[in-house]
Regions:
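Acidic, Ser/Thr- and proline-rich intrinsically disordered linker/docking segments
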Residues: 2-10, 15-59
């Protein structure tokens, strides 16, 4: 499984339909809902670096 830990809990990346990137948030869209991870600009950039690493490893 491709689990990614966030400040809102674990996300199963295999169930994510698409991801939207904003300056201070990242939004994961699932069938039937979405989860938004908020942070300041630096926190959001660090979060995305971690996410990109996980996504590369899961390919």
């Amino acid at each position: 499984m491709n689990w990614f830990e966030t400040n809102k809990g674990l996300i199963n990346l295999a169930r994510v339909d698409w991801i939207e990137y904003f300056t201070t948030s990242t939004v994961f869209h699932f069938t039937g809902g979405k989860m938004e991870i908020l942070g300041n600009e630096n926190e959001t950039q660090e979060f995305r670096k971690q996410l990109k690493t996980i996504l590369k490893q899961s390919r």
